[in-house]
Amino acid sequence: PRLFPLCVAVLACLGLSLSAADRPPNILMIVSDDHAWFDYGFMGSKAVSTPHLDKLAAESRVFPRGYVTNSLCGPSLASMLTGRHVHRHGITGNDPRMPAVEGAKGAGKAAAAKQKSAAFLEGRAQMIKLFQQSPILPRLLGEQGYVSLQTGKWWMGPYQTGGFTEGMTKGGRHGDEGLDIGRKTLAPLTDFISRAKKDGKPFFAWYAPMLPHDPHTPPERLLAKYRDKSPTPQAAKYHAMVEWFDETIGDIRAH
């Protein structure tokens, strides 16, 4: 699946001397998943309602033309966190390249069998090792006294491999427990922000929920809003997912 960076509230603090600033900025990095670039109110969409994102965009500098050299999840996330193109950080796919597993019929069974193989696990370990050879944003910020949190999509093993001080992902292929963020709860993120503020620590929070990515299971109250005005039932579900994601941004900003 494709990932589209949404509103990346990342300030260019790494290029500055933090000692020269009165106070290091807090950073919240927001990444939506499988979200068409035009499906925002501030981008002119009439199909979806995104009031919270529109408000954020109105307060921000918006870059409407962004391009990636690899539209897969893992490589794109690696580029966001390292500031490097794919050919430099070396993460060219979500998974290591593997031959087909014999005896496993069906795409689902074949994928499950492959991901349990020793060769696959070793390949993933090598990808993570390669990723760690690049400068990684949470690690660099940690050297400047930041605390950091990983939530949502994450392909590079447990959150610690990215230099985060806290996180939800324990090491699953693309996020495991981290994928609960946004869909089931915002507590890990809001609790982290409250704790960092209480402790007087500058923070970096990575919010990359699996929204509006499938499975498209929006709340019924939102789906009902789009049933009659979307061209297809599937489009209605997707549009409702986009607004659901927007609601989480409002909840976070209100915290």
PLM ranges: what are they?
Residues P1-V8:
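Bacterial N-terminal signal peptides that target proteins for export
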Residues A12-H255:
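Formylglycine-dependent sulfatase
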